[in-house]
Amino acid sequence: MCCKLSAEFLGVVVLDQICVSETETKLKLHTKDWKRVCVLKEGMVFRDELGTNYPFIKSEGVDLCPKRTKMKDTPFYLVFTSMSSESKSFDLIEDKNAKFADKPWTFEGVDLRQCQWQ
């Protein structure tokens, strides 16, 4: 089941979609401008409004830091353990103190209540 989203961070990183299955939660993102992108696995926070944290499993379409991929309008994915179907919102936050942090993403209070799950 997936829900379309349109959350943006600094007008550059766009959170397009969340998909939840029995085994994982998959977030689809892209950048609107040419950026050298990598995923800060260390200290990545994905949690729902109740404060439940869901551990990071893997990234797809982009490497873990420090290896950066130059991309624009190319989807990439962050995969976490399966979140509760009862969740009403979530935060996705990269650790600003992580070793390779440049402009760590912060998506807070992304609302799932308007979702039309398909």
Residue ranges and their predicted role:
Residues 1-10, 14, 23-25, 34-39, ...:
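Surface-exposed edge beta-strand/loop patches
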Residues 19:
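Catalytic phosphate/metal-binding cores of nucleic-acid and nucleotide-processing enzymes, i.e., regions
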Residues 27-29:
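Long, intrinsically disordered, low-complexity accessory segments associated with secretion
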Residues 55-74:
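An anionic, turn-rich surface loop/hairpin at beta-sheet edges
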